[in-house]
Amino acid sequence: MSDLSYLDTLGNKELLAKCLEHGLPGVPVTDSTRSVIIRRLKAKITGVPLNKSKSASKKAIPRRETVHGSQVTTPTSEPVRRTPGKSAGRTSSNNNKISEQSRRTIAYGLDNTSISGRSVQTTTTVSDMSSQSEDDDSYMVDSPVPNYSKDQQPRRYVSLAKSGVLTTSYTREVDQPLYEQEDIPRSYTYERPHVPAATLHALPTYEPRIEPSTYRPTDLGFSRPLLTQTNLNSTSYEESSTYNPKLSPISPRNTFSGSARPFGGPAPAPAPIRQRQSVPVSGSNLARGRLLQPTTAVNTLYPQLNEFYDQPNDAGEPMETESESEVEEVPINSHFQKNRFSPLARKPLVRHHDQVSPMAQFRALAVSLDQKYNLKFYLILVVSVMLATMVYVVLTPNA
């Protein structure tokens, strides 16, 4: 190796030429690959493999060895006689040979903790299966065979493979690594965090003063039946003389206030609640029916309906019921005639039963289009543009 020390003093180009001279691939020589190329070139010149020195320097690592053992039975010198129609039988000497000679276990441990960090103990079991290759037909040897009872009859050895040698290996980990326990949630049900309930701030309520009012009875002797809505929203009739609102033990409670004033403003004047006055019973009232009154005066959450039914009626007519009667057009027409010039007034819907002329239809169409698209504005714009164009053409001299 002393004669090859000159390779370290060669330049990159000279070293590349030396590699090509000895049949090595022309790899560019750099500072990082220079030492590797010099080592390969020395191995090529001396004829020594590159990895021989490395393999010799390394320590021998113990490897697991598997020992296979087999026991071959020698044929007996005694004559063999075949007995048809009988099951397979073995002598006690053959059983002893199989149990003592043909089965052995080699168990040893390898200390390879430096490689994998754990020691593995390997157990190899070698069995001789050559003696189990007999045919289904039995062969009986002329030797004294002891008589076995059913309880003491020897058990036949069952083979697990077709090969002559059965190898069983058991691997057991001596030191198992300890894994950290994963944080498994106890429940997958989301629990809402408990937040203390906020205090409720009740708004001030304004209860108007309840004053009894009189109801004017009609001169015709008719009295309007009292309409009262019970808790079950059912309406029934009873004689009006049996109920007196002044004698009720519980005063009616007003739960509705129509005031929309701000909190800091002055309180509005409470509107008095009208109450009906008892009217003597007449024959016509009995014919109409009687109003069943509840035991206590109940004021529902419908003050508008109560005010509607509390309005006085001078005509003395009975309660109005829904009927499909024709609507009178006279008050509607008079209303629109009074408010004709009002900005919010609508035109009356008048149905013309006679046939409308085409000119009237065209006029109505033009009016509707003018209201929707402003046709007058566009018409004036087009006419003005045409007039301006004509004036420009007349005043411009001909070229």
Curated annotation (Swiss-Prot):
Disulfide bonds: none annotated. The keyword Endoplasmic reticulum applies. The chain crosses the membrane at residues 377-397. Residues 68-77, 89-99, 233-256 have a biased composition (Polar residues). Its main location: nucleus. One of its GO terms (cellular component) is nucleoplasm. Residues 4-48 form the LEM domain. It is a single-pass membrane protein. PROSITE patterns: LEM. It is found in: Nucleus inner membrane; Cytoplasm; Nucleus, Nucleoplasm. SMART domains: LEM. It comes from the Eukaryota. Residues 49-103, 119-141, 233-287 are annotated as: Disordered. Disruption phenotype: Viable and fertile, with no obvious phenotype. In the salivary gland nuclei of third-instar larvae, there are increased deformities in the nuclear lamina with 1 to 7 abnormal O-shaped Lam-containing structures. No significant decrease in adult survival, however double mutants with either Ote or MAN1 do not survive to the adult stage. Double bocks and Ote mutants larvae have small brains, their imaginal disks are reduced in size or absent, and only 10% of second-instar larvae reach the pupal stage. In bocks and MAN1 double mutants, pupal survival and larvae development is unaffected. InterPro entries: LEM/LEM-like_dom_sf, LEM_dom. Keywords: Cell cycle, Cell division, Cytoplasm, Endoplasmic reticulum, Membrane, Mitosis, Nucleus, Transmembrane, Transmembrane helix. GO terms for biological process: cell division. Inner nuclear membrane protein. May have a role in maintaining the structural integrity of the nuclear lamina. During pupal development, plays essential and redundant functions with the other LEM domain proteins; MAN1 and Ote. Also has a redundant but important role with Ote in larval development. This is LEM domain-containing protein Bocksbeutel. It comes from Drosophila melanogaster (Fruit fly).
